[in-house]
Amino acid sequence: VKKEDAQLLLDKFGLSVDPDDADDFHTLLAAVHDCAEDVAKLPDYQPVPDLSRYPRQNIRRPAPEEQDFGQAWAHKFFIKGNADGGPLAGKTVSLKDVIAVAGVPQLLGSDVIPSWTPITDATVVTRLLDAGADILGTSTCENFCHSTSSYTSAQGIVENPLAPGYSAGGSTSGGAALVAGGVVDITIGGDQGGSIRVPASLCGCMIAPEKTIECLADIPRRCWSEAHTWPGSVYRHFKRRCGE
């Protein structure tokens, strides 16, 4: 990184670096560049999902007659949880359509870019399966998760199961509707600005926000400034939350 690089970047915006600050900007850019170079040299970290233990069955975009509450499902499939059981044995789960499941296309609530298909599972998916939960599919989210309503997804509108024709909230719109409507026991979402809290409230569900640091591997961010997400689960009944 050269000392004049900062000014060259700013020229296109009609801005300038104060000469007194030039050395500081050079130090900052050089440090960021060196960090990026070091990271780029690291081997890629790509966890391999256990497809023999947890095979994916019948991955598909649901036909209209398979949908619930408008367009609550992004993709349907079936993954059987741990055969040895676990604390979530017998529970059914849906995942917000920003949580990677190997082999399942992600739509992210948009049609601006083509869907992409992950080749690994998000950490939360592995933990659910190991705990015995059965995963039934991915649920519709709002367009790039930028809405707390339930009508911005390119895949279609999600209706509130308790009040058809009204918003289910967002951006975890499909998941909240599936839980409130009794289709699944639990849904997993992500929240930076109300994306779990709003739909849980509008659909009358319990919310169980995480209090610990979670690994966010294979959960897309909307921008580089989002260094964290607030994962959480949504339940129908208080007794279920307490494990009864």
List each model region and its residues.
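A diffuse structural propensity rather than consistent per-protein peaks
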Residues: V1-K2, G193
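Gly/Ser-rich catalytic/binding loops embedded in alpha/beta enzyme cores
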Residues: V17-I188, Q192
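Fold-level recognition of mixed alpha/beta catalytic cores in primary-metabolism enzymes, strongest
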Residues: A31-D34, D38, L51, Q155, ...
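The catalytic Nudix box helix
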Residues: F13
